[in-house]
């Protein structure tokens, strides 16, 4: 049999198409209880290409395309099935979220990609995001091919932690706005702050249990009081995942911001909210001097590894540049 990469054939799986959230959770509960693995598919812009590469495919896939309850959108509520382009075009969405959304991929992909899919985006690594034949040629990948006893190619001889990189855009902006994330399963619902949702492991990625999914995100009442900016490093402006991304958000005050938050993406296995660094800069605010100190502290706080296109040293240097660029609005009087 020819297994050439150019064939891009997905492995066989059973597709489930529930018409409601209740039905979706019933299906997921039955599969989870019987020990059968499955994936949720929303827009499919990340999952389906991964299936074509034979990256952790499952025997069952549950489509959320017909679950209308997950598509609600308002100033404080964003459903998991809201399309990314809807965030760009909606008048009810926070301006920072709209801007970040406009910088994700391309219009074509944003019309398919969803909020939940972006938040739950699989981590990436150039040893992982390759064809099955390529991975076999280097004796497999720890993240994808655990059953082979493969070693991690980024940090060899440890095989206790996958360091694949989280390269989605929405999470740092939502963190800076104080968003909460809401999950559901056949056993009930639970909620948490967005930073609590992520788990620093390139394989597990987050706290979702088998049979559980993201239903929506909510913003606090003071979200409209926050303004900010997002700056992103990538190879091509109209396509690529962030090699580094920085959100700086603040509440306006007299002569200085009254509150300040900074979050990053593309620099580790999870997006990070840098509250200590932001608080230190805010404690003795001196305008450009404080911005320079903030940018340097964020550079020191991140620790990227060699598993994306740009080398870690360059990405760390650019984090300082991106932080200063995202802070320019702080100097507008």
Language-model segments: residues:
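C-terminal structural segment of proteins
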Residues: 3-333
């Amino acid at each position: 049999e020819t297994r050439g990469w150019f064939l891009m054939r997905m492995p066989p799986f059973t597709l489930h198409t529930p018409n409601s959230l209740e039905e979706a959770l019933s299906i997921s509960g039955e599969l989870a209880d019987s020990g059968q693995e499955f994936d949720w598919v929303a827009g499919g812009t990340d999952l389906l290409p991964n299936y074509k590469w034979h990256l952790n495919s499952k025997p069952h896939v549950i489509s959320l395309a017909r679950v209308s309850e997950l598509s609600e959108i308002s100033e404080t509520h964003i459903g998991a099935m809201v399309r990314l382009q809807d965030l760009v075009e909606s008048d009810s969405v926070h301006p920072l979220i709209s801007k970040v959304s406009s910088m994700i991929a391309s219009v074509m992909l944003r019309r398919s990609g969803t909020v939940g899919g972006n938040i739950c985006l699989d981590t990436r690594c150039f040893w992982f995001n390759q064809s099955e034949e390529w991975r076999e040629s280097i004796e497999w990948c720890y993240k994808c091919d655990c059953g082979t006893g493969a070693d991690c190619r980024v940090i060899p001889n440890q095989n206790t932690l996958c360091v694949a990189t989280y390269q989605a855009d929405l999470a740092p902006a939502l963190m800076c706005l104080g968003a909460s994330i809401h999950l559901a399963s056949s056993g009930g619902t639970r909620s948490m702050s967005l930073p609590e949702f992520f788990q620093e492991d390139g394989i597990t990625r987050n706290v979702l249990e088998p049979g559980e999914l993201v239903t929506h995100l909510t913003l606090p009442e003071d979200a409209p009081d926050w303004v900010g900016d997002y700056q992103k490093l990538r190879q091509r402006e109209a396509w690529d995942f962030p090699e580094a991304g920085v959100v700086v958000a603040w509440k306006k005050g007299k002569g200085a911001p009254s509150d300040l938050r900074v979050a990053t993406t593309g620099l580790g296995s999870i997006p990070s909210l840098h509250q200590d660094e932001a608080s230190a800069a805010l404690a003795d605010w001196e305008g450009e001097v404080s911005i320079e100190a903030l940018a340097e502290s964020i550079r020191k706080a991140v620790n990227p590894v060699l598993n994306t296109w740009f080398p870690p040293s360059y990405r760390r240097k650019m984090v300082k540049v991106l932080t200063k660029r995202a802070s320019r609005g702080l100097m507008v009087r």
